[in-house]
């Protein structure tokens, strides 16, 4: 879980992560499915024009508990969270999870996704399916 926590807000590379853990990609995907089904992590899919094949796209990983994520990442002070190298990703994690919770608390599973631009700068462009906006 520490290696996953260190990758919040980043696209998951299953090959790299499974290699670092010394397990197969299949086992890694099983573990991530368990973490997602127990609501410890949220896997945000890449935006697809047709909405199909969401399971086979790149996903960004977010922790539903930012305190647990901070602990697993070794952030022991508020200064580390505010000024640390990953403070922007921790804030992104917080925003995504708050949006997710706002839908789920109303009993709605939102169709959220991220848009990956083809430019050189990586930035989060967040998509919300319009039919869920109230």
Regions found by a protein language model. Give the residues of each.
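Accessory nucleic acid-recognition modules appended to NTPase machines
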Residues: 1-133
């Amino acid at each position: 879980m520490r290696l996953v926590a260190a990758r919040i807000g980043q696209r998951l590379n299953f090959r790299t992560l499974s290699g670092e853990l010394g397990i197969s990609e299949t086992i890694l995907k099983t573990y991530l499915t368990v973490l997602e089904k127990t609501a410890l992590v949220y896997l945000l899919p890449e935006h697809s024009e047709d909405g199909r094949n969401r399971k086979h796209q790149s996903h960004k990983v977010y922790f539903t508990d930012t305190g647990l994520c901070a602990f697993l990442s070794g952030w022991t002070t508020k200064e580390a969270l505010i000024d640390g190298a990953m403070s922007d990703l921790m804030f992104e994690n917080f925003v995504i999870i708050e949006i997710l919770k706002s839908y789920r608390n109303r009993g709605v599973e939102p169709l959220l996704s991220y848009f990956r631009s083809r430019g050189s700068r990586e930035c989060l462009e967040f998509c919300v399916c319009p039919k869920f906006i109230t």
